[in-house]
């Protein structure tokens, strides 16, 4: 039984996963897709499971797809990565199944974005369908800021960045909630608190973690949403809403978990490797 740990940049999380694989005495290889090519051949089938960890969404997606072609079980699957990597696709799946999401309008041109701003009213959020760590997520307080954002986005080469997700601005309790699910189990949740010099709660932007109590509604919402998206190891960003209770804002298919471990004292890497061993390496 052998595991592939697929990376492009080795962060603390990947080091912890490797350490857990060694602790559980599982044979594994690290495949760095930023340095090594992945051929379409059956030789990759020597791996029973691949843990997909590239930072780049496209590297993660394509690595998962190539390994799947050789019969390798990937965590996460290319289908899951594709869904999580595009916020519009994520919202579409969730909204169809009745999962609360932020009120959103999709605008596919500059003119459409201006009309969406008018419909939504200020302040509002404008973000592209792709991206992580809060990049290009804009809080727009008036039409002048909005026009500036639209002009800048139009100059970007990637067509997806010219698509606008225009959303209500939610700032209830000045925090958001991040949860981690492994398999069908909610591992836990913690709050990401907005720092004084930011309006976003991302840990990468200075947000700081704290413990929270997970109530039944939060657990129910997160697990139902995860069953729709289909991820085996995902983090879910949740916002507390004054009228909707909990809304799902985003799924992450290659979850970072330093902040989660700090807030909850749960060893995520060991939980993940235990799940892999118990479900796929018996």
Swiss-Prot record:
Organism superkingdom: Archaea
Record key words, sorted: Amino-acid biosynthesis, Arginine biosynthesis, ATP-binding, Ligase, Magnesium, Metal-binding, Nucleotide-binding
Annotated PANTHER family: COENZYME GAMMA-F420-2:ALPHA-L-GLUTAMATE LIGASE (PTHR21621:SF2), RIBOSOMAL PROTEIN S6 MODIFICATION PROTEIN (PTHR21621)
Reactions the enzyme catalyzes: [amino-group carrier protein]-C-terminal-L-glutamate + L-glutamate + ATP = [amino-group carrier protein]-C-terminal-gamma-(L-glutamyl)-L-glutamate + ADP + phosphate + H(+)
Primary enzyme class: ligase
Protein name listed in UniProt: Glutamate--LysW ligase ArgX
Annotated InterPro entries: ATP-grasp, ATP-grasp_RimK-type, ATP_grasp_subdomain_1, LysX/ArgX_preATP_grasp, LysX_arch, PreATP-grasp_dom_sf, Rp_bS6_RimK/Lys_biosynth_LsyX
Pathway stated in the Swiss-Prot or TrEMBL entry: Amino-acid biosynthesis; L-arginine biosynthesis
Subunit structure: Homotetramer. Interacts with LysW.
Motif stretch (GF motif that is essential for ArgX substrate specificity): 259-260
Family: Belongs to the RimK family. LysX subfamily.
UniProt: ATP binding residues: 87, 127, 131-137, 167-178, 202
Residues noted as binding substrate in the record, renumbered to the chain: 192, 203-204, 256-260
Gene that produces this protein: argX
Residues annotated for Mg(2+) 2 binding in this entry: 250, 252
EC number annotated for this UniProt entry: 6.3.2.-
Gene3D superfamilies cross-referenced by the UniProt entry: 3.40.50.20, ATP-grasp fold, A domain (3.30.1490.20), ATP-grasp fold, B domain (3.30.470.20)
Function of the molecule: Catalyzes the ATP-dependent formation of a covalent bond between the amino group of glutamate and the gamma-carboxyl group of the C-terminal glutamate residue in LysW.
A single MF term (Gene Ontology): metal ion binding
Cofactor annotation comment: Binds 2 magnesium ions per subunit.
One Gene Ontology CC term in the entry: cytoplasm
Limits of the ATP-grasp domain: 91-277
């Amino acid at each position: 039984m052998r595991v592939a740990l697929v990376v492009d940049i080795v962060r603390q999380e990947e080091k912890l996963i490797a350490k857990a694989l060694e602790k559980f005495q599982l044979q594994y290889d690290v495949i760095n897709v930023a340095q090594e090519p992945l051929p379409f051949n059956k030789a990759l089938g020597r791996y029973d499971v691949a843990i997909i960890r590239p930072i780049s969404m496209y590297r993660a997606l394509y690595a998962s797809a190539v390994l799947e072609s050789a019969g390798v079980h990937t965590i996460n699957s290319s289908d899951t990565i594709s869904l999580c990597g595009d916020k519009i696709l994520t919202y579409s799946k969730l909204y169809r199944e009745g999962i609360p999401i932020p009120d959103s309008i999709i605008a596919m041109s500059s003119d459409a974005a201006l009309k969406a701003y008018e419909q939504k009213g200020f302040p509002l959020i404008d973000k592209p369908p792709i991206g992580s760590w809060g990049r290009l997520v804009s809080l727009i307080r008036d039409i002048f800021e909005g026009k500036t954002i639209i002009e800048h986005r139009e100059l970007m080469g990637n067509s997806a960045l010219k698509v606008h997700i225009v959303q209500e601005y939610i700032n209830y309790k000045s925090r958001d909630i991040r949860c981690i699910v492994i398999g069908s189990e909610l591992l836990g949740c913690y709050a990401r608190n907005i720092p004084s010099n930011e309006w976003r709660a991302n840990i990468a932007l200075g947000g700081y973690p704290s413990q929270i109590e997970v109530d039944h509604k939060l657990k129910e919402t997160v697990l139902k949403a995860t069953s729709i998206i289909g991820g085996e190891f995902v983090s879910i960003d949740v916002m507390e809403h004054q009228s909707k209770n909990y809304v799902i804002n985003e799924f992450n298919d290659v979850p970072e978990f330093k902040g989660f471990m700090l807030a909850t004292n749960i060893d995520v890497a060991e939980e993940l490797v235990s799940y892999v061993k118990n479900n796929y390496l018996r």
